[in-house]
């Protein structure tokens, strides 16, 4: 006996018209229901999966009994756990709950900017022995097919399920037993992701102006129930900041006090948990650069992990598993250098490690990594070799005028002239004669030439 999803099996016969798939239909009911559904429009059945005939002619449609599952996030795998993934269908026992999900690659469309955009695929369920892969055994490795079955089903025999006739049977909304985990990045068609008012608003102009139709047509224009608004998060944040006495419109500035707090918070952490940044530099976290700490130079010492070049170096850092299982470890007890005799003495240990990070030229960003490594490895040596010992500028003592120098060892340049030397000399007879003429009264010369 074949089973029909959505129909309870019954052994009772009837004198009505029985279709080929075993579903009882009365002729007047069938015609009436078709007229009600179409309302004068041509019936266009939805094709869920297609395959080409050997002759290469027409397209043979396969109709799933259930609504599809659509992907909405790229890169997500379609999969169910073992024993899960078969939709619930009244009238189908658990022994027949076996089949496969078929990936239907949808068409692409042209966007406003002229580019082609491919729609993400949609998956449909077919019982074992039906659909586009009816001839394949359960578990056959086929691209775009994911096999599922309940724990009570016999996967060695096809499911005794009739094919769906779209003219008489509508697709059943996909539902799963409790505990089923839906694949991440997928949603069930008709589960509420589409706009709920689109159907009522699109059908409203074609309905007769009855009371019921008016209420349905206006349902799309109703104001939504007060709920979450787009700016509700901003309002809540503003209320919280106002409660704390802060202004949300003013940008938060990093003051010396906040920088000191951040630095102290970092330094309170164990040495191996510190992350240097602008507020707490590399030397403040780990000390000066030297033979045992030979990485870092220039801006990277000031910025630490905030340096724009640091993230690409972080790709080389080992994981916790690689650190413990891929290194040579040695536990050593060291001297406690706390220096406070009042505090109880603690046993201090060091977990010393020795390992290597191996990479080659095929690594993404290899050239940049090599450049950054060459700039920062043993950079402290280049800084000491190229550093110039410039004496500090002498500071002027309070009350001392500019130009006064108290150091007698500083030599002063020789004056360039006698006037600059400011030395006294004896007057000659010619000088005395000139001085007398300057003292005589001035008389105007009236002689004619």
UniProtKB/Swiss-Prot annotation:
* Listed GO MF terms: RNA binding
Where composition is biased (Basic and acidic residues), the residues are 423-440
User: What is one GO cellular-component annotation here?
Assistant: viral nucleocapsid
The upper taxonomy is: Viruses, Riboviria, Orthornavirae, Pisuviricota, Pisoniviricetes
Superkingdom of this entry's organism? Viruses
Query: Organism source for this protein?
Result: Porcine hemagglutinating encephalomyelitis virus (strain IAF-404)
Q: State where composition is biased (Polar residues).
A: 29-38, 45-55, 194-204, 212-227, 400-410
User: Which PROSITE patterns does the protein's record reference?
Assistant: COV_N_CTD, COV_N_NTD
Function as written in the Swiss-Prot or TrEMBL entry: Packages the positive strand viral genome RNA into a helical ribonucleocapsid (RNP) and plays a fundamental role during virion assembly through its interactions with the viral genome and membrane protein M. Plays an important role in enhancing the efficiency of subgenomic viral RNA transcription as well as viral replication.
Instruction: Give the residue ranges for region: Disordered.
Output: 1-55, 158-231, 266-297, 387-449
Q: What does the UniProt PTM comment say about this protein?
A: ADP-ribosylated. The ADP-ribosylation is retained in the virion during infection.
> Which ranges carry the CoV N NTD domain?
61-190
User: What's the protein called, per UniProt?
Assistant: Nucleoprotein
């Amino acid at each position: 006996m074949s089973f029909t999803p959505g129909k309870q099996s019954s052994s009772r016969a009837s004198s009505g018209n029985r279709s080929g798939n075993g579903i009882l239909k009365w002729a007047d009911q069938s015609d009436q229901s078709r007229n009600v559904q179409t309302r004068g429009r041509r019936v266009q059945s939805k094709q869920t999966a297609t395959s080409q005939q050997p002759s290469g002619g027409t397209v043979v449609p396969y109709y799933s009994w259930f609504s599809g599952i659509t992907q909405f996030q790229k890169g997500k795998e379609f999969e169910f756990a073992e024993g899960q993934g078969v939709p619930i269908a009244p009238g189908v026992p658990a022994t027949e709950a076996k089949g496969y999900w078929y990936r239907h690659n949808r068409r692409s469309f042209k966007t406003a900017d002229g580019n082609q955009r491919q729609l993400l695929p949609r998956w449909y369920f077919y019982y074992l022995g039906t659909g586009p892969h009816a001839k394949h055994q359960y578990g056959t490795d086929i691209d775009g097919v994911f096999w599922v079955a309940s724990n009570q089903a016999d996967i060695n025999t096809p499911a005794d399920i009739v094919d769906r006739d779209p003219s008489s049977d509508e697709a059943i909304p996909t539902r799963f037993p409790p505990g089923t985990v839906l694949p991440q990045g997928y949603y069930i068609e008709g589960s509420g992701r589409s706009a709920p008012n689109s159907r009522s608003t699109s059908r409203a102009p074609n309905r007769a102006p009855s009371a019921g139709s008016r209420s349905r047509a206006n349902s799309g224009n109703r104001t939504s129930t007060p709920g979450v608004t787009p700016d509700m998060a901003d309002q809540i944040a503003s209320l919280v900041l106002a409660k704390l006495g802060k202004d949300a419109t003013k940008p938060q500035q990093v003051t010396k006090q906040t920088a000191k707090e951040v630095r102290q918070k970092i330094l309170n952490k164990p040495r191996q948990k510190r992350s240097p940044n602008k507020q707490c530099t590399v030397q403040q976290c780990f000390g000066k650069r030297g033979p045992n700490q030979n990485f870092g130079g220039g801006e990277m010492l000031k910025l630490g992990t905030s340096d724009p070049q640091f993230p690409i170096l972080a790709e080389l850092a080992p994981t916790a598993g690689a650190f413990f299982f891929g290194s040579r470890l040695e536990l050593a007890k060291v001297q406690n250098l706390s220096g406070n005799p009042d505090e109880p003495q603690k046993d201090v240990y060091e977990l010393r490690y020795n390992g290597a990070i191996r990479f080659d030229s095929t690594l993404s960003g290899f050239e940049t990594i090599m450049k950054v490594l060459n700039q920062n490895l043993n950079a402290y040596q280049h800084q000491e070799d190229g550093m110039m010992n410039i004496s500090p500028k002498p500071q002027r003592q309070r009350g001392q005028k500019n130009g006064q120098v108290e150091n007698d060892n500083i030599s002063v340049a020789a004056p360039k002239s006698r006037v600059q030397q400011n030395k006294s000399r004896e007057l000659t007879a010619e000088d005395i004669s000139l001085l007398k003429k300057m003292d005589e009264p001035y008389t105007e010369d009236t002689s004619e030439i």
